[in-house]
Amino acid sequence: MSESSFSLYAGRGNPNWTATGPREAFHALGYFALDESRRVWTADNLGGTPERRGIGERFDSWVRRHPQLPGVELLAACVQYALARWAFDKDEFVHELADAVTGGTYPVPGRMLTHAEHIVRGYLGFEMFGTRPPKGDMSLFATEGAAAAMCYVFDSLVKNGILAKGDKVALMAPVFTPYVEVPELDAYGFEVVEVRASRSAGTGVRQWHYPREEVAKLADPAVRLVCAVNPGNPPSPVLGDRVAEQIKEIVATANPRLLIVTDDVYGTFVPGFHSLAADVPRNTLLVYSYSKHFGCTGWRLGVIGLHDDNVIDEMIADLPQERKDRLARRYRSLTPEPEKLRFIDRLVTDSRPVAPRHTAGLSLPQQAMMVLFSLFDLLEEGQAYKERVRQIVRQRLELLLEGARMKTADDDRRAGHYVELDLLAEAERVHGKEFADFLEKTYEPSDPVFRLAARTSVAAPPGGFDGPEWSVRISLADLDDMDCLKIGHHLGEVFREYVAEWTRSPSPRGPAGEAGHPGAAR
């Protein structure tokens, strides 16, 4: 079946909702910025650069004159909130916004705009750290999404001699496919150590937990770095306090220079989420993307966060002198004291060839959108939006399981953006181990996926991501409610076929003629 013949792809990760309010505010900001541009210079389709002096008062006047413009009320609320919380100079802040949305200049600083960094740091602190923020500050580098951020991190760690070919890099598996593939690229050649989650049977969809003995692999000082997606993808539980405490203990004792890369893109879907970047701040690079929460995959909005007091800067300072001299030559065009250049700033330079470093950094309109998403979230309207999208994925999971006649244990720590249905586990739960063995010996793990596609023209990819072979990965965020119900129903139909084939097979152990389950209507 060709890709074009599929009517629905059930594994794509981008959500089918968008945050409309911040986008309206963005466009309103654009109209204000264009008025400011024409104020400076007006000609046919030509304007000037917005002027800083007095722009704050002009913004207030502009808002009063355009009460009916969509987004203007939210834009004004965002600006007011930022001024009240961070005590920004009004002209400086409003000018940064107007200049950013116009997109007429390079990002300066290249790492992130000054006011934007304060605001995004505030957003991350609220959503990722909650009531237990780490002491000190975290510096940010705005990137073209989380995948780009991950590539920048690996590349810069290698260029700065923190990682080398053959080093051991751990992955908290199952994990997002690029985290599996990137360390194995010839350019890096890392030895991958899997820290594998186990699946407790529970009821229905299996629950994922990291056993102590698996997490203990990180205590080996030869393991230089560990990558985690928290909450997970595609199984979506958080790592949990027990795992976080074990990692903290490992860093405090056996492996104090273990580096942690945590991708927390799904954190906003879990009430009370707490990032490893708060638990182990000195060792952790926080990677975050706005794509899933705000429905903005196409915007490519991501960020890397690194605590100002971190072990990477210490490790660079402790490099052999010959290596430090070589790095000094690499970065000497940036600063008269290249040996003091922080890793977070090296990331920016390394994201481009050093010579055209002035092209580094996320585009200004992207940073303006990031700022408005962040400020929106910190307002009451943003918190109501957050609860609504959480309800959306919870409801879709319930409908999927209802259609399939499957069950899952209640877990308010599950993000629910994705779900991975372990079909072999469900077969064993309902019909016993002999039925599960029959499936495993008789069919390829991808067989239920192809049967589902043939029945429905729905492409539901295998679980993959180093997860169980006999699994189906469903993106609840990208499916309508009724699609979830229908996919669940057709999965049940597929299993009824398997049960019928099992009962017709030589010496079947199952009750002949039993209606299959999951999917068996009782």
Pin down the residues of each PLM region.
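Active-site PLP attachment segment
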Residues: 16, 277-339, 473, 484
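Short, flexible/disordered intra-domain loops and linkers
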Residues: 20-26, 105-108, 199-209, 235-242, ...
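Conserved core of the PLP fold type I
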Residues: 47-255, 267-281, 285, 480-482, ...
